[in-house]
Amino acid sequence: MSERRSIDYIPESERHGHPFSQFTLWFGGNLQITAIVTGALAVVLGGDVVWSLVGLLVGQMLGAAVMSLHALQGPRLGLPQMILSRAQFGVFGAVVPLVLVCVMYIGFSASGTVLAGQAMAKLLNISHVAGMLIFSAIIIVIAVLGYKVIHKLGKLASIVGILAFVYMFITLLLSADLSALAHNNHFSLPTFLLAVSLSSSWQIAFCPYVSDYSRYLPRDVSATKTWCSVFFGTVLGTQTSMTLGVLTAAIAGSAFPGHEVSYLVGLGKSQAMAMVIYFAICFGKITFTTLNAYGSFMSLTTIVSAFRRQTVLSQKCRIAFVVLMVTASCIIALLSEPAFLKHFTHFLLFLLAFFVPWSAICLTDYYLISKGAIDIPALSDPQQRYGFWNLYAITLYIVGVLIQLPFIENPLFHDSLTWIFAGNDVSWIIGWFGTGVLYYALRRFDRRSLPAQSLFPST
């Protein structure tokens, strides 16, 4: 049952599946409590109900459109996402964004471990610490088993999530003043853009690993069907969760922040139903956190392989890498639980500054400059066309981060030009388009020798 492949090329003989598997994975993976908490932040931080929901949806669609373009690279090239960055940054140069991606995976996994640990503790009548440790052990097992098990988990998560969310929505709305919610409608540009940033950053954060879960699809699979499956799966799943978060925060007020799990479980009208909701929370977090653990294993493997010059990984190394990343997440979760909500908000928004220019460079290069042509064997050999470092791409990546800094409005970082946009954080828009335009306009300085068509390993 355990997956044999890691970051190496998936030959056509091992390809399988249908684009709809992407829908169930991203739909089910986003029906979970961290997305609920993120949606709630739009209200907790001052937004109204109506325009928070609209802003979240706008952000979902913007971020998911970019994310889905990354997903198309998986079936076309048969490789996980981050090793493809070597085509733009060089074999060693790709380590720069890879290290940041690993930090992101650890952060998301840690936040998920905090919330899942609370639910696991209630479900099994154990301490929060024990709940987090058991949850982390489950994540290790599933991440080691790999691709097929993760997709099966996504299908189950879709079913469990739909049932749990339908119940929670009905219970919440039956006890609420719907008229008051509908009239909670006072547009404010700062809080609207905050909602857009929350959801767009959520989606863009998936870009570094989305093709990890599409790379086994047949090479000739429909690009339109694949794009739509990822797009609608992640938008519908995340918007459902964030809508529940907005409504819950608006109804519960100060009773929700810091008590997210207990409040949602309180929607259960009996002990049995409360246990079902605890289970649904745990199951949803298992799916989502497994995506992060598997992605972190892929990224760490890509970093190590740059220096070892081989992409095949033994089962022992696979287990060791997964254990290392999950353990790091668990330790952070154990140390940061009391301040979870505050720190997670800052972390999620600040991540945009580092992943927006990476995404812009990768997509601009793949779709507009390389025209989808990648020399796959050269990705593992710095002596070939992609070299050790591509200073052109690395320089523009740094520029892409820097041009965002004056426009960032975040407790972790605040700069001087946010007044132009009434104190709103629009750095991600400036960073993505600015980096993409610069990368394309200055392409004559790129010294790579690009292939006329994709070159695949002999199998």
Q: Predicted segment positions?
A:
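Helix-loop-helix connectors at the membrane interface of multi-pass transporters/channels
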Residues: 82-86, 113-130, 218, 292-323, ...
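Selective recognition of specific alpha-helical transmembrane segments in multi-pass small-molecule
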Residues: 32-35, 58-66, 101-110, 142, ...
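Transmembrane helix-loop boundary segments of multi-pass membrane transporters
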Residues: 43-54, 118-132, 148-157, 263-269, ...
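Membrane-interface "cap" regions at the ends of multi-pass membrane proteins
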Residues: 1-49, 191-197, 215-225, 446-459
